Amino acid sequence: MSHQETWHETLHDHFGQYFTVDNLLYRDTTGQQDLVIFENAALGRVMALDGVVQTTERDEFIYHEMMAHVPLIAHGGAKKVLIIGGGDGGMLREVSRHPGVEQITMVEIDAGVVTFCKQYLPRHNAGAFDDPRFKLVIADGVNFVSQSSEKFDVIISDCTDPIGPGESLFTSNFYQDCARCLNEGGIFVAQNGVCFLQQDEVVNSHRKLGHYFSDISFYQAAVPTYYGGIMTFAWASQNPALRQLDTATLAARIDETALTCRYYNAAIHHGSFALPQYLLNALSASR
């Protein structure tokens, strides 16, 4: 790619987005995936895997804040957190902002993603890879949870879309193993695509999670990079009360954590579980 060449995302047929490549920083096959990192005047540094944008400097905070703080604040006392994926370090950065968390394990299938993101996307991790609570495991997340005897309070599946290496992170076996690896009162959350364009993905996750969790829902956030509507996150636990905390309780926990965010707050947390009617209809029809 040369200066001002355009890069086109290939996630959806017949519809997509493009970026101008103002400065190509890296492109290669890591051994697992095709990785490209470039600079764009509108969104800063952009990372894509296998033709799909994973993160940009400009708006990554929305995604990472919502994936990390919604389950951690709702739990209210998480000590051990498992991140599946998350090689760019953004999820680790947000989880590490919770002083009550004592152990953060991140399982990333591709060591190359971690290495290159440390070099080319340093703002994402903001030094969190050096946190003494952090442990990096280079392994397949599916295999890790299937073989693990550890228990966690929160599991965050910061997965790619269900294509390539990320496909196995949307299977019934993976969800079953995650449920087994949670402590009592634990919460599982996962990236679940843009529901307007990827509704089947949400419906399938809802159906599969229902076999292993008694409370399944979804929450949403507006992340500009993930075009086509509102970003959807799966939520699963055995306790519906964790999903129904009022804004006063959420605000008190946020204050106690001394958490200051750019997107996430108590009202956003509470309101993010309100879903559009077309998605509610689809979920109801799938039961």
Curated annotation (Swiss-Prot):
Q: Which UniProt keywords apply?
A: Cytoplasm, Polyamine biosynthesis, Spermidine biosynthesis, Transferase
Question: What are the EC numbers?
Answer: 2.5.1.16
GO cellular component terms?
cytosol
**Do you know which InterPro entries this protein is assigned to?**
PABS, PABS_CS, SAM-dependent_MTases_sf, Spermi_synthase, Spermidine_synt_N, Spermidine_synt_N_sf
* Family statement: Belongs to the spermidine/spermine synthase family.
Describe its function.
Answer: Catalyzes the irreversible transfer of a propylamine group from the amino donor S-adenosylmethioninamine (decarboxy-AdoMet) to putrescine (1,4-diaminobutane) to yield spermidine.
Question: Known catalysed reaction(s)?
Answer: S-adenosyl 3-(methylsulfanyl)propylamine + putrescine = S-methyl-5'-thioadenosine + spermidine + H(+)
**Which Gene Ontology terms describe the biological processes this protein takes part in?**
spermidine biosynthetic process
GN (gene name): speE
Which GO MF terms does the UniProt record name? spermidine synthase activity
The answer to whether keyword Zinc-finger applies is: no
| Residues binding spermidine, per UniProt | 64, 88, 158-161
Q: In which pathway does it act?
A: Amine and polyamine biosynthesis; spermidine biosynthesis; spermidine from putrescine: step 1/1
Principal location: cytoplasm
Q: Which PROSITE patterns match?
A: PABS_1 (PS01330), PABS_2 (PS51006)
What does UniProt list as catalytic? 158
Where along this sequence does the record place binding of S-methyl-5'-thioadenosine?
Answer: 33, 108, 140-141, 165
Disulfide connectivity for this sequence is none
Name it: Polyamine aminopropyltransferase
Lineage, uppermost ranks: Bacteria, Pseudomonadati, Pseudomonadota, Gammaproteobacteria, Enterobacterales
What CDD domains does the record tag this protein with? AdoMet_MTases
Primary enzyme class:
transferase
